Swiss-Prot record:
Protein keywords: Disulfide bond, Glycoprotein, Immunoglobulin domain, Leucine-rich repeat, Membrane, Repeat, Signal, Transmembrane, Transmembrane helix
UniProt main location, coarse: membrane
Membrane-crossing segments per the record: 534-554
Signal peptide: 1-29
Parts of the chain on the Extracellular side: 30-533
Recorded topology in the membrane: Single-pass type I membrane protein
Species per Swiss-Prot/TrEMBL record: Mus musculus (Mouse)
Protein name from the UniProt record: Leucine-rich repeat and immunoglobulin-like domain containing-NOGO receptor-interacting protein 4
Sequence ranges assigned to domain Ig-like C2-type in this UniProt record: 412-502
Length: 593
């Protein structure tokens, strides 16, 4: 070893230690004693350490900092400004009540900020300044009551905002201004009484909107009109929502709509009819009792319908006709006794059918389901029979391909009991026809009027729930034959009855229409041919009697005068000519005939 190299070799073993000592404070080699650090992931974990201030000496290249579950009460401006590489900051479940404007200044790389479970009350402008790269902000479980105008104006990269479980009562119209990339927002368990439509209209890139557990009674027409890019809308647990206004979804072009655990009593067809691109519809846990025929046909691209945990008792034939892409139906946990093949446009295209939890009657109406049982996805619980008794509790998957006699059969409908086949009623009276039938499954009763039209459940002439035909305020035009038809899936039977109507004249003897009356105003006077004949008779008979009486009196008078002379003589005095002064008078004799 020469003198030139000796000094160099002497300090080389100490060079790494010297390098670390010369690094500025807070490098990755340092870690606060109250925290745990990992150099591989550049993460610092200081959660649940009862800290009331942010510890010093944090590594400058930290990318994840977890300070959750401590006692932090506030953040001052620039407190974290040295952590320029920080990407995720968790401040959840502290006691933060104030965030000074500029508190996050210098965190230009931060992507995720979690502030849930604190005591924040008002979010105003400037609080989140400097967070130009932030994509997720979680403000749940605070005490926030107001979002002021411009509260998030500097978060131009924000894509997801969570603000549930707050005391939120008002969202200023410009609160969400500047959130040009926000794609998802969740408002849940707040005190909002209306949907903040004006504020939401400031979100041009919003794709998913979740409105959960809100005490809002209605979604007014046009409330979400400005959200043309919205694809997913979730309305969950609005106990006061009983119906959707027809125009409540106007302006939307949704592909997924969920209105669950509300109080809808029927499918809101009028509000849905324009959603031609809707693929998924979830109306589960609503008191909906029926799906009528063809009302879903405007939703031509609908693929999935979920209506589990509702009150469904019937799904009509042709209920899903017009839905050429339909492949999933979830109606588990309802009150359905059957599901007929005719409800679907093409049962073979059905992939998933959730039907468990229904009191199914395993008769001929479910033979199609038995045929497809090995191909269909029934989920974790396949449907089971609730009746007849000999198959009660048996899953559809347990049946063999060759059925024993008496399994999955039906009996055609037959009329067993009916009232009089000929009924006579007075005009303005009341007429009733009874009709019932037997069969398996139990048949339905329908009535056809004389003109050939089927009668409904409402109106002056209506069919009651028990199949009875009731005609109130009988009119002359109600006269004719009425046909009772009892039918089920196995067949039908019919019975012809007749109604005869007796016309009743008003007390004043006129034949005016008794149906046209107004209090205090006399109605118009109309006569039919019989009335005209009566009027003519009443006028002609007195006239004829008077003329006959006159001629009779004249005849009696003439007989009282004796023999009648048939000639008479009278003098005729002609004009005297000017030249004849002695001419006398002329006598003329005329005969009376």
């Amino acid at each position: 070893m020469d003198a030139a190299t000796a000094p160099k070799q002497a300090w080389l073993p100490w060079s790494p230690l010297l390098f670390l000592l010369l690094l500025p404070g807070g490098s990755i080699s340092s870690c606060p004693t109250v925290c745990d650090c990992t150099s591989q992931t550049r993460a610092v974990f200081c959660a649940h350490r009862r800290l009331d201030t942010i510890p010093g000496g944090l590594p400058l290249d930290t990318e994840l900092l977890d300070l959750s579950g401590n006692r932090l009460w506030g953040l001052q401006r620039g407190m974290l400004s040295r952590l320029g590489q920080l990407q995720e900051l968790d401040l959840s479940y502290n006691q933060l009540s104030t965030l000074e404007p500029g508190a996050f200044h210098g965190l230009q790389s931060l992507l995720t900020l979690r502030l849930q479970g604190n005591r924040l009350r008002i979010v105003g402008p400037g609080i989140f300044s400097g967070l130009t790269a932030l994509t997720l902000l979680d403000l749940r479980l605070n005490q926030i009551v107001l979002f002021l105008d411009g509260a998030f104006s500097e978060l131009g990269s924000l894509q997801q905002l969570e603000v549930g479980d707050n005391h939120l009562v008002f969202v200023a119209p410009g609160a969400f201004a500047g959130l040009a990339k926000l794609s998802t927002i969740t408002l849940e368990r707040c005190n909002l009484s209306t949907v903040p439509g004006l504020a939401l209209a400031q979100l041009p890139a919003l794709v998913a909107l979740r409105l959960r557990e809100l005490d809002i009674e209605r979604l007014p027409a046009g409330a979400l009109r400005g959200l043309g890019q919205l694809k997913e809308l979730e309305i969950h647990h609005w106990p006061s929502l009983e119906a959707l206004d027809p125009g409540s979804l106007v302006g939307l072009n949704l592909s997924s709509l969920a209105i669950t655990r509300c109080n809808l009593s029927s499918v809101p067809f009028q509000a849905l009819h324009h959603l031609s691109f809707l693929r998924i519809l979830d109306l589960s846990q609503n008191p909906i009792s029926a799906i009528p025929a063809r009302r879903l046909s405007p939703l031509v691209r609908l693929q999935e319908l979920r209506l589990s945990g509702a009150c469904l008792t019937s799904i009509a034939a042709h209920a899903f006709h017009g839905l050429t892409a339909f492949h999933l139906l979830d109606v588990a946990d309802n009150a359905l006794q059957t599901l007929e093949e005719t409800a679907f446009p093409s049962p073979d295209k059905l992939v998933t059918l959730r039907l468990s939890g229904n009191p199914l009657t395993c008769d001929c109406r479910l033979l199609w389901l038995l045929r497809l049982r090995r191909r269909l996805d029934f989920g974790t619980s396949p449907p089971a029979c609730a009746g007849p008794q000999h198959v009660q509790g048996k899953s559809l998957r347990e049946f063999s391909d060759i059925l024993p006699p008496g399994h999955f059969t039906c009996k055609p409908a037959l009329i067993r009991k009916s009232g009089p086949r000929w009924v006579i009623a007075e005009e303005g009276g009341h007429a009733v026809f009874s009709c019932s039938g037997d069969g398996d499954p139990a048949p339905t009763v329908s009535w056809m009027r004389p003109q050939g039209a089927w009668l409904g459940r409402v109106g002056r002439v209506r069919v009651l729930e028990d199949g009875t035909l009731e005609i109130r305020s009988v009119q002359l035009r109600d006269r004719g034959a009425y046909v009772c038809v009892v039918s089920n899936v196995a067949g039908n039977d019919s019975l012809r009855t007749w109604l005869e109507v007796i016309q009743v004249e008003p007390p004043n003897g006129t034949l005016s229409d008794p149906n046209i009356t107004m209090p205090g105003i006399p109605g118009p006077f109309f006569l039919d041919s019989r009335g005209v004949a009566m009027v003519l008779a009443v006028g002609f008979l007195p006239f004829l009697t008077s003329v006959t009486l006159c001629f009779g009196l004249i005849a009696l008078w003439s007989k009282g005068k004796g023999r009648v002379k048939h000639h008479m003589t009278f003098d005729f005095v002609a004009p005297r000519p000017s030249g004849d002064k002695n001419s006398g008078g002329n006598r003329v004799t005329a005969k009376l005939f």
